[in-house]
Amino acid sequence: MVLINGVAVVAVKKKEPIVIGPIEYVKVTGHHGEARVKGKVDTGASRTSVDVWLAANIGLGPTVDVAKVKSAFLDEVRTRPLVRGVVEIAGVRFALPVTVNDRSDMRYPVLVGMDILKSGRFLIDPTKRAPKYASKTQKVDPHPA
């Protein structure tokens, strides 16, 4: 405690941000289970997005609204369902609405957007590699053959 102009000030240590890379393991939890999959961290995406197959498999939902999403590659706005879900990245859990989209032609079934990144808990290091997968949670292949 320090006295400044006669006022007691308690120094509070700010929590250090958690350093994450551009690709991280993400746990997504729904009504029927959970899955740990690799997800892409995207500072250009306003919302977190989950592949439609993965969302159905673990029971994300119900649909709470629709979101208008502008594609980075196409000059058009599309609507996507917003469903309730729980997303965990680097040990931090977020209960939030996520968009559901067909990501079968994309490398990662989850896109972590600014709705999570704005929490201020993360620092993104583009040189950091995704951690090795080590968990008792069963991995789910988001796009089975």
Named regions from a protein language model:
Residues 2-145:
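Pepsin/retropepsin-fold aspartyl endopeptidases
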